Design a protein with these regions (language model features):
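N-terminal small/glycine-rich loop or linker at the start of catalytic domains
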Residues: 7-30, 109-122, 141-156, 202-204, ...
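Active-site beta->alpha loop and helix N-cap motifs at the rims of alpha/beta catalytic domains
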Residues: 82-147, 154-165
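Hydrophobic faces of well-ordered beta-strands that scaffold small-molecule active sites
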Residues: 17-20, 52-56, 83-89, 108-110, ...
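Glycine-rich, proline-tolerant flexible connector loops at the mouths of alpha/beta enzymes
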Residues: 51-75, 112-125, 154-158, 182-193, ...
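Catalytic cores of alpha/beta
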Residues: 95-100, 220-232
Length: 305
């Protein structure tokens, strides 16, 4: 899809896309994919859509989830894309790492706390205690030949309310062999101006780190915030097919892709000619209908009067 619009060529860059449909998208109220459905979605995302990475589950949820992850890992290995399969894991005395390993995976997206409130009220730990547990989990994951990415849960609130805590954590975390830092707007509170400010601060303070941005759509700003994050130095974006996700959803894959390419000339590896196909597949499996006027993939999106 192309538009005759002047592009901001000074901003051209290559953006890594991680699809979270099978993990965060499944948090949509009433949505639960069967193992074979998760495999079919994963196959299309990896092979036909050519997304860079897929987050396929949360560790230790159920035996059905374990079966699904194992199937996906086996398939991904046959096409040389096992490194593209990621699982959300926890700081839980190595149980998540072992669970992922038993499934055949070796990339963990480790969930840490990005705000002082989450650290002290949810975990009931001091920042120093939390850091020690994170380091121990990472050491164990590395001993299993894992790649470690790290979520800073509630990052947006942390930047707004407890920046000293967040920077103290990051100052220590950047010393560890973490491949990517995943920065979620967990409660969907950001606007694009805040997203620009916060992402620029992260990039300037930690210029050698890779940052992903993970948007939520509570104010209908997930796509706008994703674009703001990229223009401010984020190297990766998290999306879901049809914008599925808890509460009001996540940034939709199709919208993010076409805006990045058409409006800003950003480079991705996404094959746009299959976006409608993956949208229909997920629509069928999820039971969540795509509105006819949905941008890019809606039935009315290409009709002009």
């Amino acid at each position: 899809m192309n538009v005759n619009a002047k592009r901001d060529n000074s901003r051209i860059k290559e953006i890594e896309i991680m699809d979270c449909t099978l993990r965060d998208g499944e948090q949509t109220n009433g949505v639960s994919f069967l193992p074979h459905e998760k495999l079919m979605i994963a196959r299309m995302l990896l092979h036909d859509i050519n997304v860079d990475r897929i987050e396929v589950a949360s560790a230790r949820v159920s035996e059905g989830e374990k079966d699904a992850v194992a199937r996906i890992c086996r398939y991904a290995k046959t096409i040389g894309k096992l490194d593209s399969v990621e699982v959300l894991g926890f700081v839980d005395n190595n149980k998540s790492v072992d669970w992922i390993a038993e499934c055949g995976g070796h990339v963990i997206n480790l969930l840490a706390k990005g705000s002082y409130k989450h650290c002290t009220q949810q975990l009931k730990m001091s920042p120093e205690e939390h850091l020690a547990h994170i380091k121990q989990t990472i050491d164990y994951a590395l001993s299993k030949d894992f790649t470690v990415n790290l979520y800073l849960e509630d990052w947006s609130s942390g930047m707004r309310d407890s920046r000293d805590y967040l920077f103290m954590m990051m100052d220590e975390l950047v010393k560890l062999p973490i491949k990517r830092f995943l920065l979620p707007d967990t409660l969907g509170i950001l606007n694009p101006l805040q997203c620009v400010e916060y992402m620029r601060q992260m990039v300037r303070r930690y210029p050698d780190s890779h940052f992903d941005f993970h948007a939520h759509n509570d104010y209908d700003l997930a796509v706008s915030n994703s674009l703001a994050a990229v223009l401010s130095g984020a190297k990766g974006l998290h999306v879901t097919v049809n914008g599925l996700g808890e509460r009001c959803g996540n940034a939709p894959l199709a919208s993010v892709q076409v805006i990045l390419k058409d409006m800003f000339g950003a480079k991705t590896n996404i094959k746009e000619d299959r976006l409608n196909d993956i949208s229909r597949l997920v629509e069928g499996y999820s039971g969540i209908a795509v509105a006819p006027n949905t941008p890019v993939v809606g039935d009315l999106s290409l009709i002009h009067i």
